[in-house]
């Protein structure tokens, strides 16, 4: 799952996701996808910089976007039914907005947390030489890594894709579905470094 948002705030009092995309896989290959643009009744404005980076198109979202109440049941069904939920920086960002969406509809999100696999955390752990040990809790490991800072550790999706020589259209990143397609390729490189 990946969310494109108005800004980097981690809750709905200042931010919402205007695009939420999901890819279903067999562990290696894409089987299905959902790509939602969401229209919110909100006073939030996206900055010109954020519009440029994410290619946010307000008229497109207004014309093609769905109401949150129409997309949440599908998102919930996919996430609740998933064995794992893989995302790049999902521990540090996306899960907070997913949590807010679950809360908005009176649902609990906590059962999702043990399913989270964050490719950013995995890559950072490898680069910082803090490997995951099978005897430790994987969720706790990821939270420890996301909160460990080291200079010079490059783990953005673009950096990892290029480091792994992955063929991808990098100019289209920050479209959630395009990000997920690259993240699946990155995951297919990183997963062999783990013993889950």
Where does each model-flagged region fall?
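Active-site catalytic microenvironments for nucleophilic, acid-base chemistry
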Residues: 100-105, 125, 129, 163, ...
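Acidic two-metal-ion nuclease catalytic site recognized across multiple nuclease folds
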Residues: 138-151, 161-165, 177-196
């Amino acid at each position: 799952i990946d969310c494109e948002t108005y800004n980097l705030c981690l809750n709905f009092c200042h931010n919402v996701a205007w695009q939420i995309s999901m890819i279903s896989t067999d562990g290696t290959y894409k089987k299905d996808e959902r790509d939602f643009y969401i229209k919110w009744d909100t006073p939030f404005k996206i900055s010109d910089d954020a519009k440029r980076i994410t290619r946010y198109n307000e008229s497109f979202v207004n014309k093609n976007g769905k109401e949150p109440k129409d997309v949440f049941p599908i998102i919930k069904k996919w996430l609740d039914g998933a064995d794992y939920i893989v995302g790049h920086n999902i521990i540090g960002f996306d899960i907070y907005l997913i949590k807010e969406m679950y809360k908005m509809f009176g649902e609990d999100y906590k059962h999702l947390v043990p399913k989270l696999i964050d490719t950013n955390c995995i890559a950072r752990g490898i680069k910082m030489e803090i490997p995951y040990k099978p005897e430790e809790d994987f969720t706790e490991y990821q939270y420890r890594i996301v909160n460990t800072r080291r200079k010079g550790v490059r783990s953005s999706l673009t950096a990892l894709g290029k480091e792994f020589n992955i063929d991808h259209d990098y100019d289209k990143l920050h479209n959630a579905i395009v990000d997920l397609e690259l993240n699946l390729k990155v995951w297919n490189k990183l997963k062999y470094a783990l013993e889950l």
